[in-house]
Amino acid sequence: MGSPDIPITYRIDARDRPLSSIRVRPAAGNPQRGWLTADGWTIPVALGRGGIKANKREGDGGTPRGTFRPRQLWWRADRHSRPRTFLPARPIRREDAWCEDPNDRHYNQPVRLAPGQAGDRLTREDHLYDFIVEIDHNAAPRIAGRGSAVFLHLARSNFSPTAGCVSMTEAAMLRLLRRMGRETRIVIG
């Protein structure tokens, strides 16, 4: 005798799926500060010293306006365990850096630097890059001078402006990472 088919149902909570979108908008009266809204909660963020810019250029301090996708998480494994996320995750190594030279063929890409070699190293002492979400700003195609190393990362305690990134507290970053996947849209502007 066979056993009857018994349907099994699983409750899928919305928190078990990546967010469809995250919205970043400037704060009224202060273009270097903003608000990030996701799944019904809103957190303060720091923006670039140039505010949100529709036509981002290298070195202008602007946070690019547009819709982006997260590519991957980079994190300091020497300081933190791997956070829960739907994103691909990569531990940051001592030699990891980001090319910000528009004349270099590796512009706006991760690179490995030799000890003493200049570049935007991802191993910072100040903890701002303990968690980095790489986004697809100026990624395909990469256009020299249109901006590089635009990330979501940790904020300074006073929420001072960034060079063009969106920064937040560690608690907010960890909460956001739990719901962020490669298909999540990051809408800035």
Regions found by a protein language model. Give the residues of each.
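Conserved "landmark" site that anchors the functional core of diverse proteins
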Residues: 169
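Cell wall/extracellular polymer interaction/catalysis modules
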Residues: 2-162, 173-185, 189
